Amino acid sequence: MYSILVNALGMISFTLVTTAALHANAQPSSQGGSRPPLIIAPTVEGMLLCDEAVAQKNVRSMEDAYSYCRQRKLDGSGRVARLLDRLEPGGPKGTVQVGYTATLQLLALYRATPKGWEIDPARVDEFLGVIRKVQRPVVIYFSADHFDSIGPITEELRKDPRNLMQLRDGKPLELGYFGYRIMPYTLSTDPALAVNKYRQDALNYVAKRIKTLPQAVQSRIVAYTLAGELHHLFPDFENGMGAYQDIQVTDYSPASVAAFRKWLSAKYQTIEQFNTRTGLVYASFDEVPAPSKNIRKEKLAAFGEHYDAFADGTLPIAGWLWDPNKTIQQLDLFVNGKLIGEVPRGLNRLDVYRAEASITSPNTGFRFDLDYSAMPAGKHRAQVVATSNGSRHQLAEVDFVVVPRDQGRVASARAAEVPSLKNAKALPGVRSWLDMPKQLQDVYYNPLARDWNLYRESQVHAFLGEFHQWALKAGLPAQKLYSHQIVPNVNSSWNPQLFAAGQTLQGSAPWKQGLNMYGGATNSPWLRDFMARNKITEYGVPEFNPQQWKLQGTHLAAMRSHYDAGAHFISPYYFSIVHDRFKGAAEHGVNRMELRPDNPKDGSDSFYKAIIEYAKN
């Protein structure tokens, strides 16, 4: 989610190396066998900023600096090369090699002409010029998601509502991310839409230009990451990823709702089967709504309209657990005294890590998404039970209420529970908290809401699939095509329904997986298990930052874990070659992560040093 900083200030890039050089140095991994070198390909802010502009004291802004460089056909290749040589002196070699990630915003390539919007060849020239000159491996990131929003064509695209996702009121989201405007571009794959035509044409043009590069340069391109973080959008994009109350989601545009009805028709075949399986009553699929109303606050024409964070039949039982002595061997969820299953733990809770000095790992989260869809109406009790040396202790308990569709009264009798549990607070060193659900949370299962969420996931998958097809048809090599995706579920306090990205994260996808990782996700047993369950083998990490500072060796351990797991590349976020006089003074969640030896925030200085150390391998 942090790729916007470099997008706002200029394209980014990483060093290049020939395929022969990469594979000549293949070495055994610690798990046995051999593998090609791991490419450490940091995001570099300011890739197009030339030394000559920096030397001109009268050049005061980044915009003026870039103009100065473009007018003289200069670029930042020298500055990029010097940065990477500091990280790995003497060029790329060994089992770990330093490169860089070059970001190209596709819609930003367009300029207005008397004939309409056309690609500016000079913008592509300057981008590829750096790639030609910097002799190190490079990951090229084709940015075409909601962060591709700074080009002059953006204003024209936003005037046509067909290009944008909409909230239920028919309006597109007005979003920002640390001062950077976000555009809620549609996930529709309709090639007639202007936004899709311009994105595909730009990708075709750049791919054609790449194929004219000398073979030695092309071979230094180790991966292409596609489109950026593709997912649905929601209000308060900076802070709202964990919203569960009064949620709003996309896409309720007329085209999206019409496609939802077609999706339902394909799934159920007939309206009679739909009515039978859902218990809802509609005369035709054309009458079926995209659910959008909260039954607690709004009048429904029919129950199928109900939508909230729990309407799809899942209730998260989630919180955090700090157990530094590894006293607890297992967490289990019991509902009404019956075992439901083991509670996944070790999920990312960077907020807890930041809030409490004595907690030295962000991987404290636990979460079980309880499917309550088949449970009877009434009050139920959930208990999170910890097993320690054969004894069971209650870590948390909470009551929730399943409400019938008619909102009729339910029995208030005390639900059954696991008796005679010890208190987990008595376990030495153990600290915990239950965040969700709130006590007596009321839930209303609407099967149409479950379908709506699945359909929204299919929209994200379909667009990424279409973008992947564009790349293949443009002639880019299939073995180098990676996604650039977020994994919301690794953060136990987030609401994955807001993103609806789950279907894109399967190992069966035609693209290779590129999974962004921040905080505890960078070295996460939960995420490794997730990848194993989803049969993800070949992968890369297009954005990577542990954001930790409390324990020595954290950053090295995280990078080594991905070497051992077979990652092709990881892209530390982020380095900057922008002169300080061009940077804003305000600190925010993104620029805290600038990797430099004098920036202790979020452990950025330690990560900087760890990259230098690891590149010696």
Where are these regions (language model features)?
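The substrate-binding groove and active-site-proximal loops of carbohydrate-active enzymes
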Residues: 62-76, 103-120, 179-202, 445-461, ...
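Aromatic-lined substrate-binding rim segments of carbohydrate-active enzymes
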Residues: 74-179, 190-212, 463-474
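Bacterial N-terminal signal peptides
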Residues: 8-20
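Substrate-binding cleft of secreted/luminal carbohydrate-active enzymes
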Residues: 43-46, 136-149, 222, 228-229, ...
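Aromatic sugar-binding surface patches on proteins
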Residues: 348-370
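Catalytic domains of carbohydrate-active enzymes, especially glycoside hydrolases
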Residues: 32-43, 56-110, 122-141, 470-474, ...
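Polysaccharide-binding and catalytic clefts of secreted carbohydrate-active enzymes
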Residues: 160-330, 334-342, 346, 377-379, ...
